Amino acid sequence: MINRHTRQLPAAPALPRWRRALVVTVVLAAFGVVLVACGEPDPPPPPPETTTTTTTVAPATCGAPEGSGPTAVAVMGPCPRLDADQIAFWFGLNTQVPYNATVPLATLVRLFLEEGRAEGVRGDIAFAQSIVETGWFSFPGRVPASANNFSGFGATDGTADYGVFPDARTGVRAQIQHLRRYADATATACTVPPLHNPCVDPRFAYVTPRGKAPTWNQFGNGNWATDPTYASKVLAVYTNMLGIARLSLA
C-alpha cells in the first residue's frame, strides 16, 4: 500500500557543465597548495667557499743556537730560551732592591725580547746584562733611571758622561743594536738594512772591528767594559735565570 502522506524529495538539479569545471579547478588548486605546503623543504644553500690562510708565528722560546755552550755563549740567536713570564717571575723571586725603571717590569722584559728578536740578538741574556749594569734596575750609580739607559751606555771610566734616551724602548733598542755590532760582522752600518729597526745607537760606529765578540765569554777587558770579570757576572745572572726552567747555560 502506498503511503499517500510520504512525499518524494525532488532530485538536486544538475550543475551546469561550466560550474562543475570551476569546482574541479578550485579543488585541484587547493589540493596543489596543500601538496606544496606539505612537501619536502628545499635543501639549504651550500656554505660559501672559504680560504684558509696559514700564518707562521715565531716560537716564544727556542733552544740555544748551534755551537753555543758554557764556554762560548752566543750573543746572536733567533729567539730567547726564556719567555717573558718566566723572566718576570724569576726577577720577582730574586730582586732585593727597589725597581726604579720608567716602565713596569713586565713591559721592560717584553721590550728586551721584542727588540732582541728583531735584530737576532738573544734578548733574555741582554736583560741579564742590564741587571748587572743597573743594579737590578735600582740605578744606584751615576746613570739615573730617567735616562732609560739600561747598559751603561756612554758611562765610560773616568768621565761623568752617560747616554740618555727618550723612552724605555729606545734605550733597549740602542743596547740591542750595540750588541749586534759587537757580535755580527754583517752589521756594517747603523742603517736599515742591515739593521731591522731604525738606528738609535749613537756609538754604533765606535765598535771596531765589527763582529769582534760573537760570544758573551769575550766581553770585558775592553769589549763593552773594562772589568775583566764582566762576562762572568753577566753569565752568572743568566745561569740563575735559566734555573727557573731547569735549563743549563748555553
Residue ranges and their predicted role:
Residues 2, 26-27, 32, 39-49, ...:
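Catalytic cores of secreted/periplasmic lytic hydrolases that degrade extracellular macromolecules
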Residues 5-28:
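N-terminal export and membrane-targeting signals
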Residues 6-9, 53-58:
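Intrinsically disordered, low-complexity repeat segments enriched in small/polar residues
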Residues 12-18, 43-50:
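Intrinsically disordered, low-complexity segments enriched in proline/serine/threonine
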